[in-house]
Swiss-Prot record:
Name of the gene encoding the protein in the UniProt record: gatZ
Keywords noted in UniProt: Galactitol metabolism
Pathway(s) of this molecule: Carbohydrate metabolism; D-tagatose 6-phosphate degradation; D-glyceraldehyde 3-phosphate and glycerone phosphate from D-tagatose 6-phosphate: step 2/2
SUPFAM superfamilies: Aldolase
A single GO cellular-component term on record: plasma membrane
A Pfam family recorded for this sequence: GatZ_KbaZ-like
Record-given protein name: D-tagatose-1,6-bisphosphate aldolase subunit GatZ
Gene3D superfamilies from the UniProt entry: Aldolase class I, putative tagatose 6-phosphate kinase domain like
GO biological process, any: galactitol metabolic process
Family, per entry: Belongs to the GatZ/KbaZ family. GatZ subfamily.
Coiled coil start-end: none
SUBUNIT field: Forms a complex with GatY.
Function: Component of the tagatose-1,6-bisphosphate aldolase GatYZ that is required for full activity and stability of the Y subunit. Could have a chaperone-like function for the proper and stable folding of GatY. When expressed alone, GatZ does not show any aldolase activity. Is involved in the catabolism of galactitol.
NCBIfam families: agaZ_gatZ, PRK15052.1
Species of the source: Shigella flexneri
Length: 420
C-alpha cells in the first residue's frame, strides 16, 4: 500500500479498488480478474464479518486469511500480491456494551488482525458505546483510535511494521448501510478532515506512537457518494474540490467508502481528486446476484420440473423466515419488501448466500446447467453483455464463467478509474 500511495503522491494517476466481501465467488473473481496483471489486489474484511469470535461469517482473521489464500492457490494468483485489510476495526460490534468492555474486545480484535498478517488497518473508534455521548467528541474518537494503534504496534513484528499501514476517520453514516431513502449526502468539510487528522496526531503522540503516525496513509471522508435501496448519489467533482486541494498538503490520500454503482468516469475523477482507495462491496455481490437470478431463469426453462433447484423460491423462503439481516433496512409492506429482498442496491441478500438451504439450491442449479448446452439466444436474453463476449470468443457459455464475467463488469469500471 505504501508504494502505491507514494506513486499517487508523486503525481501518478493511480488508485486501488478495495474488495470488501467474504463471498468465495467474489474473491475468486477479484483475483482471477487481475491474475495476468502486475497489480496487487486489496481484499478487506469488516469487524462484524470477521473477528476473534468468528463474526457473522464464522471466521477469525486467521481463518479469513487462509480462506483467501486457498482461493488464490486455486486461481493461480500469487499470495504475495494480496493485501489484506481490516475495515472499521473498533467497537462497532460491541456498541451495546460500556466503553471499557467494548474497547477491551476491540484491542483484541486489532491484535488478531495484525497477528494474522493483515497489513492495512482501519482504526475506527467513532461509534458510541453504552453510556457514551452521541456523537462522541472527536478527541475521544482519536484517543480510542490511539489505543487500538498501540495494540497493533505491540504485536507487529519488525517485518510486519514495514508493510503495516493505518487508515483513520470514518464516513457518514457509520458502517452498516443506509436504513432509509437518501436524497442528498453530507460532504465532509475540510475543517472536519483537518480536525480528524489533528486530534489523531495529538492522541498518537501522547501514547508514544510518533513513528506509527508515519504509517497513517489515508483518512476516510465522505466525498459525496452514497446509495440506498434504489437511489444512487453520484460523485460531483466540483463539490469536493476543497477536500481535493487540502489533502495535497499532507502525506496521505483519502479512502472513499460506499463507492458502489458509480460510473467508471466517476471512479477516474475520484482517483484524480485523491480518493485513491475506493471501497466496493454490495455492487460486487449485486452482480453475483444478478448472474444467479439470470441462471435460475435459464434453469427454469431448460430443466425438467422434478430436477430444478427451485433456487429463487428457496432464497425468498429463507429470507422471509429469517429476516434479521434485512428487516430494519427494507420497506415494510409485503410486496415492497419482496422487491427489496430481490433487487435492492443495498443487496442484503449477500448475508444469506452461506445459508445451507440457499447454498445447496445454488449448487444444484449449477450442476444442472453444467450438464446442458445453454442456447445462445437465452444467454442474449438474460446476460446480454456476456452474450457479446461469447460471440467474440472471449468467454465460454459455462455457468461458472458467466458468473465470473458478470462480476468482472464491476471490476472493469474500477480498473478504468484506478488506471495504472
Amino acid at each position: 500500500m505504501k508504494t502505491l500511495i507514494a506513486r499517487h503522491k508523486a503525481g501518478e494517476h493511480i488508485g486501488i479498488c478495495s474488495v470488501c466481501s467474504a463471498h468465495p465467488l467474489v474473491i475468486e473473481a477479484a483475483l482471477a480478474f487481475d491474475r495476468n496483471s502486475t497489480r496487487k489486489v486489496l481484499i478487506e474484511a469488516t469487524s462484524n464479518q470477521v473477528n476473534q469470535f468468528g463474526g457473522y461469517t464464522g471466521m477469525t482473521p486467521a481463518d479469513f486469511r487462509e480462506f483467501v489464500f486457498t482461493i488464490a492457490d486455486k486461481v493461480g494468483f500469487a499470495r504475495e500480491r494480496i493485501i489484506l485489510g481490516g475495515d472499521h476495526l473498533g467497537p462497532n460490534c460491541w456498541q451495546q456494551e460500556n466503553a471499557d468492555a467494548a474497547m477491551e474486545k476491540s484491542v483484541e480484535l486489532v491484535k488478531a488482525y495484525v497477528r494474522a498478517g493483515f497489513s492495512k488497518i482501519h482504526l475506527d473508534a467513532s461509534m458510541s458505546c453504552a453510556g457514551d455521548t452521541i456523537p462522541l467528541a472527536p478527541e475521544t474518537v482519536a484517543e480510542r483510535a490511539a489505543v487500538l494503534c498501540f495494540a497493533a504496534e505491540s504485536v507487529a513484528t519488525d517485518c510486519q511494521r514495514e508493510q503495516l499501514s493505518y487508515v483513520i476517520g470514518t464516513e457518514v453514516p457509520v458502517p452498516g448501510g443506509e436504513a432509509s431513502a437518501i436524497q442528498s449526502v453530507h460532504i465532509t468539510h475540510v475543517e472536519d478532515a483537518a480536525n480528524t487528522l489533528r486530534t489523531h496526531q495529538k492522541a498518537f503522540i501522547a501514547r508514544g506512537l510518533t513513528e506509527a503516525l508515519t504509517r497513517v496513509i489515508a483518512i476516510v471522508v465522505q466525498p459525496g457518494v452514497e446509495f440506498d435501496h434504489s437511489n444512487i448519489i453520484h460523485y460531483q467533482p466540483q463539490e469536493a474540490q476543497a477536500l481535493a486541494q487540502w489533502i495535497e498538503n499532507t502525506r496521505m490520500v483519502y479512502e472513499a467508502h460506499s463507492t458502489d454503482y458509480q460510473t467508471r468516469t466517476a471512479y477516474w475523477e475520484l482517483v484524480r481528486d485523491h480518493f485513491a482507495i475506493l471501497k466496493v462491496g454490495p455492487a460486487l455481490t449485486f452482480a453475483l446476484r444478478e448472474a444467479i437470478f439470470a441462471l435460475a431463469q435459464i434453469e427454469q426453462e431448460l430443466i425438467a420440473p422434478e430436477n430444478r433447484s427451485g433456487c429463487l423460491a428457496v432464497i425468498e423462503e429463507v429470507m422471509l423466515d429469517e429476516p434479521q439481516y434485512w428487516k430494519k433496512y427494507y420497506r415494510t409492506g409485503f410486496n415492497d419488501s419482496l422487491l427489496d429482498i430481490r433487487y435492492s442496491l443495498s443487496d442484503r441478500i449477500r448475508y444469506y448466500w452461506p445459508h445451507s438451504r440457499i447454498k445447496n439450491s445454488v449448487e444444484t442449479m449449477m450442476v444442472n446447467l453444467q450438464g446442458v448446452d445453454i442456447p445462445l439466444g437465452m444467454i442474449s436474453q438474460y446476460l446480454p453483455k456476456q452474450f457479446e463476449r461469447i460471440q467474440s470468443g472471449e468467454l465460454s457459455a459455462m455457468p461458472h464463467q458467466l458468473i465470473m464475467n458478470k462480476i468482472y463488469d464491476v471490476l472493469r469500471a474500477y480498473r478504468y478509474g484506478c488506471a495504472e
